Structure formats: structure tokens, C-alpha cells
Amino acid sequence: MNINKLAERLGLEPEDYMEVLELLVDSGKADITSLEQAIAAGSAEEVVAAAHSIKGASANLGLTELSEAAKDMELNAREQNLDGMSEKIQILKAKFEPVAALFQP
């Protein structure tokens, strides 16, 4: 992940991009928890909401792979299809982890 390139693409200074990215990480952690709970409860509506949140925030920051993983979950849940969501959330978490790792001590 090239922070300078992503920031430049959005017309931001790298420091400003990192501030916004940190907000995404904070909200993303909560959204992932919500996704896990929604999947366990079989709530397609809640999966849609949490996946949509991650999709939009990550797309706005140029994190295409993370956005696509969330989009896949959202589209399936919109069709009331929760099959394979356990695998899909693992893929999403794998895309999210490198971003979150930027803010770990």
C-alpha cells in the first residue's frame, strides 16, 4: 500500500490521508464486529448495513480490494444470501488487516 500515491490521487497530503485512514480503521473495526454478529444471527439486513459502511469508506480512500470484498458481502446479503459469509468475512478481514496494522503500536 503506497500511502503517498493514495493521498496524491485524492489530493491530500500524506499526513491528512493518514488521519482519515485512521478514522476508517476505527469505524471498520466496529463494522467488522457488527458483521460477525449479524452473520451469526443470520441478519442479512445488518450485514448489508455494515458491509455498505466499509465499502463506501474504503472506496473513498482508494482501498479497492477492501471495498470490493465488502461489496461482495453487501450484494449477497441484499439477495438474502448469507451462504459463504464466514469465508467472505475472512477475506474482508485479510484485506483490512494491513490497513489496521499501520496504526498498531
Per-segment meaning from a language model:
Residues 1-49, 53-105:
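Two-component system phosphorelay core
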